[in-house]
A protein has these predicted regions:
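Ligand-binding loop in jelly-roll beta-barrel domains
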Residues: 101-127
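Short, conserved beta-strand element in jelly-roll/cupin
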Residues: 46, 51-55, 65-84, 121-124
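Conserved short histidine dyad/triad with adjacent acidic residue
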Residues: 30-37, 50-66, 101
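Structural motif
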Residues: 72, 79-81, 88, 104, ...
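Short, charged, solvent-exposed linker or helix-capping segments at domain edges/interfaces
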Residues: 128-133
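A short, N-terminal "cap"/entry segment at the start of jelly-roll beta-barrel domains
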Residues: 1-46, 135-162
Length: 162
């Protein structure tokens, strides 16, 4: 058995250059030995558990959808708004919600205090993401942080191949 305490895990801050997107993470699964870059599923773990904290008035990430990944959220404290394909839904402590592949989503801290939540994701190898607001695609290489972001036009499958 492996055990960690959330209070002993380093909090890693992240924010966009313009400061609209701000969130901090505690990688619980990584603290338990998960190796995100490994192709060995016994080292990757079948899912990833992360604690997140977002300041008031901020968003976690741009509105996006995953090609293959599932994400399950559990709100610990604070108040937020979840943007999704059917509109917006308010969430508070105790609320759980899930997004499957190709379901665009975004979390916004609409309260006056930090919004904290857990995220459980399956983080499949070869994951890609789509950003409907900007028309961009993100393709992960070895991890979500090691990525390529592209913006292009639709083309024929065999364009440039024959």
């Amino acid at each position: 058995m492996k055990k960690v305490n959330l209070n002993e895990i380093k909090e890693d801050p992240w924010q966009s250059a313009g400061g609209k997107y701000v969130v901090s993470f505690k990688g619980i699964s990584e603290a338990l030995g998960r190796e995100p870059a490994s192709l060995d599923l016994s080292k990757r773990h079948p899912f990833d558990l992360e604690w997140s904290r977002m300041p008031a008035g901020k968003c976690n990430f741009p509105y996006h959808a995953h090609s293959a990944q599932w994400e399950l959220y559990l709100v610990i404290s604070g108040k937020g708004t979840v943007r999704h394909k059917d509109g917006r839904t308010e969430v508070v402590a105790g609320d759980a919600f899930i997004f499957g592949p190709n379901e665009p989503h975004q979390l916004i801290n609409s309260g006056d205090e930090d919004l904290t939540y857990y995220v459980i994701a399956d983080n499949p190898i070869g994951e890609a993401g789509y950003y409907p607001d900007s028309g961009k695609w993100k393709v992960n290489k070895s991890s979500a942080a090691d990525r390529v972001v592209i913006k292009g036009e639709e083309t024929d499958y065999f364009d440039g191949e024959e």
